[in-house]
Amino acid sequence: SDCACLHALGHVAR
């Protein structure tokens, strides 16, 4: 479970 990955994707891959 990579929270950092999900967070970055959610903000950047917006």
Curated annotation (Swiss-Prot):
Source species of the chain: Nautilus macromphalus
Full protein name: Uncharacterized protein SMPP1
Expression (tissue specificity): Nacreous layer of shell.
Top-rank taxon, per record: Eukaryota
